[in-house]
Amino acid sequence: SRRGAPRPPIEPFGPLLPGCPPLDADGDVRLIEFSARRPLHPARFHEAIDVLLDGVVHARGRLWLATTPDEAFWLELAGAGLRVGAAGRWLAAGGDGSPERWAMASAAWDETHGDRRTDLVVLAAGADPARIAEALRWAELTPAELAAGPGEWAGWHDPFGAMHADPCEDL
């Protein structure tokens, strides 16, 4: 067996291998929370996924895609594996929910959009948190796009359809 000091990790996720990642401000491992009250433009979000695939260890959360205003989507990313799939109807669109779900939704209920929102948590190793947040903000609808409303949004190209997994052929 080899003796001496252990060699430093040679891959970007090396700091995660011992178990508890070092989340100190000087480290390369970061936890990024992203929340948006405007829907995501599906084509721009599809492009923003490339940023998530570069240095992101794990990401998960629900998405509000403009082209499907009544359906919530769920994103799950681990390493290079990605899945975006249906997560049910928003409560504001008549979705079923337990009393607990209604209570949680009512705490952040929006008069216009109800419980529709995007919430993602991203664990990144060696990735730039500002770049990730910028890519996700870029995917949000602009104020003019938001004002156009769901009738306009329905005609946009949606690379997600009912679900999405990488590798993706819709680039």
Task: Mark where each language-model region is.
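Well-ordered alpha/beta subsegment
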Residues: H113, T118-A162
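C-terminal accessory "lid"/substrate-recognition subdomains
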Residues: S1-T112, L146-L171
